[in-house]
Amino acid sequence: EWYQKDYQSFIEYNITDVELVDKLEDKMKLIELCLTMAYDAKVNYVDVLGSVKYWDILIYNHLRKKNIVIPQKRKNTKAEKYEGAYVKDPIVGMHNWVMSFDLNSLYPHLIMQYNISPETLYGQQKVKDMTVDKLLDKKVDTSILKGVTLTPNGALFKTDTKGCLPEITESMYNDRVTFKRKMLEAKQEYENTKDPKLLKDISRYNNIQMAKKISLNSAYGAIGNAYFRYYDLLVAEAITTSGQLSIRWIEHALNEYLNTLLGTDKHDYVLASDTDSVYITFDKLVNKVFGERQDTTKIINFLDTIATQKIEPFIDKSYSELAGYVNAYSNKMNMKREVIADKGIWTAKKRYILNAHDVEGVRYKEPQLKIMGIEAVKSSTPAPCRQKIKDALKIIMSGDEKMLNTFIQEFREEFMKLPVEDIAYPRSVNGIKKFTSDSGLF
């Protein structure tokens, strides 16, 4: 109807749409991301939106180079549920001097470490009554493992030859490391020079490394999908339970290390942990070294040194012990410091704010808020409120209670005067006809 009655405005509206998409692509480069993934895997563009067809073709091309014929697809029953990732209940509240440590590409590295692949699985029989807790407490005698490695769900994988999945993921990961390094170098240069040309370089390098990251992480999802050619519940669960073991292993090890270092007993220094990260408070260490004379820059430099020279080597040693204990194909767990924050607040699982001064070696002149799961980053929160929540969080980090109360009261008055279209958001309502019609109301 619009097309027929007002052709000119219809055309103008569509031109505006095209311009907006072009601007979004110039900044986000999402189309470029899809194209990068499609060319990498030799798939159609639509296939990058899922993991099943994408990885089916990746594996086919990899095996074809080796003159290996892929198996026929089997009709699988509906996929059963299996164990997921581990997320620790956080220590709720505000904490000072927090550092986070992140495992690089956890699931792909678990595939490499345990040589997880359809053809390396040692039969469908599991080791009975095997759990993450038993391996954490070293209640399992693993000295009998010869030519196989053990995962916490009881699956065994051969270690005499490298599987096709570890080969593909290792190649992808090496490419990702290259482009992520280029992205971080460009980010640091931008922080120093503020040259706007660098923003496009950052976006381009980020998209290439993201293409690799998405491809790597989707391998595990494909294996657990009943429509995948190489679907195997035992293999998928081997990956997730091995991830649980890795993050809980290092949580226990770091707590023991810091309790010994600081002369405390059973104090929990790990504030929170999720699939591939741990968040640790170093407040006691900072107070012990600096006392009341606390210079922010000196403390950040000190914590950076502690992370690289003490914590990371200890983590490497701990993960080497784990790899030896389960007779892994190789030790691929690589955990590095991500964030240094002077303050962090947790409200629940995966809901936190960090006042970050340094992220992955990129030092900020002014601290940046790293927000996860808080209303300030939720699209369902009205835009004016999202910005004000962020402003309020900055006051929480650097101001006092009086400043915060004043800010809230001022915005309360401002909010009441805002037009409804600025603070409303679309939501559907069910059953309007049922509850408003004369026949159905009573």
Protein language model features and the residues they cover:
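Active-site cores of enzymes that catalyze phosphoryl transfer or operate on phosphate-rich substrates
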Residues: 147-228
